[in-house]
From Swiss-Prot:
NAD(+) binds at residues 69-74, 103-107, 127-128, 140, 149, 167-170. InterPro entries: Dehydroquinate_synthase (IPR050071), DHQ_synth_AroB (IPR016037), DHQ_synth_fam (IPR030963), DHQS/DOIS_N (IPR030960), DHQS_C (IPR056179). It catalyses: 7-phospho-2-dehydro-3-deoxy-D-arabino-heptonate = 3-dehydroquinate + phosphate. Keywords: Amino-acid biosynthesis, Aromatic amino acid biosynthesis, Cobalt, Cytoplasm, Lyase, Metal-binding, NAD, Nucleotide-binding, Zinc. Its EC number is 4.2.3.4. The keyword Manganese does not apply. Transmembrane segments: none annotated. Pathway: Metabolic intermediate biosynthesis; chorismate biosynthesis; chorismate from D-erythrose 4-phosphate and phosphoenolpyruvate: step 2/7. Its main location: cytoplasm. This is 3-dehydroquinate synthase. It is found in: Cytoplasm.
């Protein structure tokens, strides 16, 4: 087992990464406050792992909420179902929520934990690659609105993150590839390109799910993320760099309809759009862009949305983004592989060119 610690002062917490962690009750129970525990999961994950978690909680008063599975259910209506379950069971402020599932479950559970009785504890048990390397770490919680992704939410840190890589054994190949988009994103953000080179050299074995490499990949991804979050918890500066490809990607999800593309699939195209704009702005070479595209393709990720989205609708969707300031879209671009920056003075004609290249 590998352990990381996200240093946020009194809000610091461990991230456990390993095999068969769902059999190690002490890892979970030592982070539970009070006697009441609510497990939030979905219809896909519940038959696979709910009983395992329940078996660790026999000394607690526990209940569960089983939600429908999918990004389209990441709404205030679904969140209200969790609130209702907590109130009906008379859970008090000392309770702990457990998010057992992927990013949608984790984001909604965290949002409920941030809001219920003005804040209760919660624990992340991510079961998808995307949630293990990204959404379970860092305290971002929230839901989608019909006009924009993750526009309603809060920062609320978990008490721990428990990553059992055996949950990836039941993850389908499309979901696994979706998680690889966020992994590749870290490769593009990390100085010296050590992680990017690791991914290039091992992409075949990683896609074949070689466990020793998966643990290392998840560990390095989480390490890179916590290094940034520890410096900028509330995304006032450097943490914004973690949104590479996300302004484009969120617009894809919003325009196509949530769930049409998996989040990581949208981010894959978004990363390529950001790198293409970086190339047109004179930062990246065509060879560097080709390297990035090649890695995304080897991870079985989409690289285009041609014929799927109207360019004008796409541009409108880009304006509904948390990074928009005074009506100006702020983008994360690459000066070179391993060095991202926040850009708000890009050439609008070049942005239009990129959107048209990818949409039409």
């Amino acid at each position: 087992m590998k352990i990381l610690n996200l240093d946020l002062g009194y809000k610091s917490y461990p991230i456990y990464i390993g095999q068969n962690l769902l059999l190690k009750g002490e890892l979970l129970t030592k982070h539970i406050s009070g006697k009441q525990v609510m497990i939030v999961t979905n219809t896909t994950v519940a038959p696979l792992y709910l009983k395992k978690v329940q078996n660790l909680l026999l000394s607690f008063e526990f209940a569960q909420v089983i939600l429908p599975d999918g990004e389209k259910y990441k709404t205030l209506d679904t969140v209200n179902c969790i609130f209702s379950a907590l109130l009906e069971k008379r859970f008090d402020r000392s309770c702990t929520l457990i998010a057992l599932g992927g990013g949608v479950v984790g984001d909604m559970t965290g949002f409920v934990a941030a809001s219920y009785q003005r804040g209760v504890n919660f624990i992340q048990i991510p079961t998808t690659l995307l949630s293990q390397v990204d959404s379970s770490v860092g305290g971002k919680t929230g839901v989608n609105h019909m006009l924009g992704k993750n526009m309603i939410g809060a920062f609320h840190q978990p008490k721990c993150v428990l990553i059992d890589i055996y949950t990836l054994d039941t993850l389908d190949s499309q979901q696994y590839s979706s998680g690889m988009a966020e992994v590749i994103k870290y490769g593009l953000l990390v100085e010296y390109l050590n992680f990017f080179n690791f991914l290039q050299e091992n992409i075949k074995d990683l896609m074949d799910r070689k466990q020793s490499l998966i643990i290392e990949m998840i560990y390095q991804s989480c390490q890179h993320k916590i290094n940034i979050v520890a410096q900028d918890e509330l995304e006032m500066g450097k943490r914004t760099l973690l949104n590479l490809g996300h302004t484009f990607g969120h617009a894809i999800e919003n325009t196509l309809g949530y769930g049409t593309f998996l989040h990581g699939e949208a981010i894959s195209v978004g990363i390529l759009m950001a790198t293409r704009l970086s190339q047109l702005e004179g930062y990246l070479s065509s060879k560097q862009v080709a390297k990035i595209q090649d890695l995304l393709e080897k991870a079985n990720l989409p690289i285009s949305i041609i014929g799927k989205i109207n360019a004008s609708a796409f541009m409108k969707a880009m304006l509904v983004d948390k990074k928009v300031i005074n009506g100006n879209i702020r983008l994360i671009l690459l000066k070179r592989l391993g060095q991202a920056f926040i850009c708000d003075n890009y050439n609008n004609h070049l942005l239009d060119q990129v959107v048209n290249e990818f949409c039409q």
